[in-house]
Amino acid sequence: MKLLPREIEKLELHQAGFLAQKRLARGIRLNYTEAVALIATQILEFIRDGDKSVAELMDIGRQLLGRRQVLPAVLHLLYTVQVEGTFRDGTKLVTVHEPISLENGNLELALHGSFLPVPSLDKFPEVHEGVIIPGDMKYGDGSIIINHGRKAVVLKVVNTGDRPVQVGSHYHFIEVNPLLVFDRRKALGMRLNIPAGTAVRFEPGERKSVVLVNIGGNKVIRGGNGIVDGLVDDVNWTVLMETMERRGFKHLEDIDASEGIAGEDPRFTTMISREKYANMYGPTTGDKLRLGDTNLYARIEKDYTVYGDECVFGGGKVLREGMGQGIEQAEALSLDTVITNSVIIDYSGIYKADIGIKNGHIVGIGKAGNPDTMHGVQNNMLIGNKTEVIAGEGMIVTAGAIDCHVHFICPQLVYEAVSSGITTMVGGGTGPAYGTRATTCTPSPFDMKLMLQSTDSLPLNFGFTGKGNTAKPLELRHIVEAGAMGLKLHEDWGTTPAAIDNCLAVAEEYDIQVNIHTDTLNESGFVEHTINAFRGRTIHTYHSEGAGGGHAPDIIRVCGVKNVLPSSTNPTRPYTKNTVDEHLDMLMVCHHLDKNIPEDVAFAESRIRAETIAAEDILHDMGAISIISSDSQAMGRIGEVISRTWQTADKMKAQRGAIDPNMADDDNSRIKRYIAKYTINPAIANGFADLIGSVEVKKLADLVIWQPAFFGAKPEMIIKGGNIAWANMGDANASIPTPEPVISRPMFGAFGKAGSENSVAFVSKAALRKGVKELYGLKKRVVAVSNVRQLTKLDMKLNDALPEITVDPETYVVTANGEVLTCAPADSVPLSRNYFLF
């Protein structure tokens, strides 16, 4: 067959398309992924038929599916489908614009060549319920005035050339085409008063008036045609006139030119509606946007960009030499990469800003650009010739997620994790051994070396926990000094009070965290005896509700203990109608139990309680459970840490209303609380919050970029240590990056030595002093965790509630401060069927 990579990938696309056809044929309304796959697949098949042109196929692509054949959200997710195929005259691009534009599609065309039965249109009834628009924006009041307060002038301009001239917003107007005739003296130090990144076009012979405004910043002109090179105030007009005459630049004094101030006089003022502004640069202060297809709206609290001086990259746009891109910027201040105009969602706030990255770290958050021509540019956020641009307009940026409960059962976990937005994995294991299937322990120094070496080139941060289940300290010291960044106590190894006490004593000695999965059997004592064994020392309790393991039925009481940092694992996030039913078999497999042994079954059943799972939802919403993690392949799903966090937040808003009654028109308080659960709080709990866990200056640039409509489900790009490590990318042979199949793929930041350069291995201070980096031949940066032994629940950002919790041992009813915690299971959740193929 001699298949090329692009052919193999299109076979995968065809499989997805044929699956979508089968679902359509049985009357199933298609989701986003299915609709794209079906349309792209059919276009390729029509190309193979060989009797239709590109233009004909662009039209046919709009006829295949109608609004009734897709889920309601798809209309607001799917705007374009592109695919390249081999026509009679070679490979060509077919772009289908607005592919869902009819009430009903032509199902015979949609199923052409599949030999599947064409379903009756009666199988696709109208949908009358309210439609959630993923990524929907709601705009604040008023309009946006750009370049407010700047001196302005209206000049008449004539194009005396024989070809059109198009002038961008930030082009120094005195430097424009020599055959444009206007008063260049009045244009000195001025540019067009139009939205950043737009342009004015002058056709041959055309005469029009334009409004110019002062350039911003230091008012320095460089580049262009080079007729001015320096401060505007230093220009000698006589010398400049001689230069223009010698070089043929036309100038005509405009004695009727009017002058004023932009924003004060309507003649000189340019206003943009908030909707148009948001479509061009992303939402601004007071605007709100929906997160995915949830019912959560984030309101922009502050916009650090400058209206009229936004950084926009592209042909004829702002970030060009001498305009938004400075010339001969100071090397120390010039960025490696800038993410422009992004909405940042972080525990610290929800705001709009440019993000500056240098040497793999965030060096600035605010206004980037060229201080010679733009207002408000921060000193360390200069855009120069060395600066790469990631367009963040209309996008959301979050910190990379931290999963701090990982069973390292298989290396494929890494790819599922990073493609979902996880950039740090903490846990233990050695592969699919039975110990690892049940517990997050890397038990021996030999295994610790293996795990640090095997992950050395992977583009994520890693930290491994040793086994903590022994009543004597020697072996614990060995594993900590071999590289363990923490210790794990697990009931499958015997989490007895003696082991707990010894493990915590060693942790105090080495300044590392202890993670605990307590004794479901109550064999050595009840939950209060385990809490007593802590003796006030800091400990991180895994799956604190108990379905994942722990004292039955009341381990959830630890969520009210000050020295306990409680977390959840995601199978119980949120509580839904199928949550309980799936858990028994899950538990039997993970913990090597035998369904033929009654005591094993009783052990499993004791851990699965609808009442405590329901209470877990509410405790998260109260901020009494601080962290959400996965429990990967061991009663947890590593690729759903983020989505299940937001599903929980969505469910709690629907059932409990606003967290802050005074801010009921947005969900910022809830959003910041929930994002802290998988970013800053696991970073604090594990002792590396000074390096990762939030979008803050000086931290490693571990960032996730999302389209708002896909937020929480499928990220657009993952940046690891300042490098693009993973991203949605189309056909590698295509003429542009967007034709199908678009797949979440590793990028250059994930290949070769890049993963070692852009990521970190976390170890103990003792291991760092012993030189494990050199002993193991590690290329990754090796960093010691620190400052975890004095932590309390009060250090958990926005999740520090300490309710007094009780659990009835017979009915399992949970109360917090005397209030019964109960909620109904959800019938459906967002971030699910609209997006995923399976």
Swiss-Prot record:
Which reaction(s) are listed as its catalytic activity? urea + 2 H2O + H(+) = hydrogencarbonate + 2 NH4(+)
Tell me a GO cellular component: urease activator complex
Question: By what name is this protein known?
Answer: Urease
Q: Which species does this protein come from?
A: Arabidopsis thaliana (Mouse-ear cress)
Q: Where is the active site?
A: H591 (proton donor)
Q: Which residues does the record give as substrate binding sites?
A: H490
Give GO BP annotations, semicolon-separated.
urea catabolic process
Q: Which family does it belong to?
A: In the C-terminal section; belongs to the metallo-dependent hydrolases superfamily. Urease alpha subunit family.
For this protein, what is the EC number? 3.5.1.5
Residues noted as binding Ni(2+) 2 in the record, renumbered to the chain: K488, H517, H543
Q: Where does Ni(2+) 1 bind?
A: H405, H407, K488, D631
